Amino acid sequence: DQTRGWFYSQLAAGVIAFGRAPYESVLMHGWMLDGQGQPMSKSKGNVVEPGKVVKEHGADALRFYLLKTSAPWEDIPFQMDGVKNARKTLNVLWNVVNFATTYMAIDSFDPQRVTRDMAKPHLNQEDAWLISRTEKLKNEFTRQVNALELHKAGRALEQYILDDLSRWYVRLIRDRMWSEEGDAEKLAAYRT
């Protein structure tokens, strides 16, 4: 129905109105499956209303769950626990951002005043490690998105958030945040 209905309607309307297709390519998943592996259907009564999921867990959690769950061309086995876990991952990211911005605000940190070159001599091993991991993630994520392997890109991002950023880096630098304002190693962590 999506292929015949929405995609074709958009294609026909775009060509008639503007003389060109409104999209270059279309990427779509297979069926949305219920907990028993059956395709969701209103007539079967096994549909999960997206609005209810968004209201309870947020749109970003639902999007992130759908992104990382299955290859775009495969069926998606919908599990509410998966959406909950996606929300937890995003909350971890939010907490990391909150941790960093709280200390940066206390110290009136301005990234325009502390350049990478100024911070580089004061990087600790964990700072250099996170910079390396971030660069690796950026390259891997870009390659996977370009290859339309969105599920792999989403999973790599999740692993980076939970393992590299939260479980390792934040724990390793936590004590440095108690250093005096202007401490070079603390500023290097901020810059990281």
Name the predicted role of every residue range.
Residues 1-7, 156, 191:
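Short, conserved micro-motifs enriched in small and acidic residues
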Residues 3-19:
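Metal-dependent nuclease catalytic cores in nucleic-acid-processing enzymes
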Residues 20-192:
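Long, charged, mostly alpha-helical binding arms that flank functional sites
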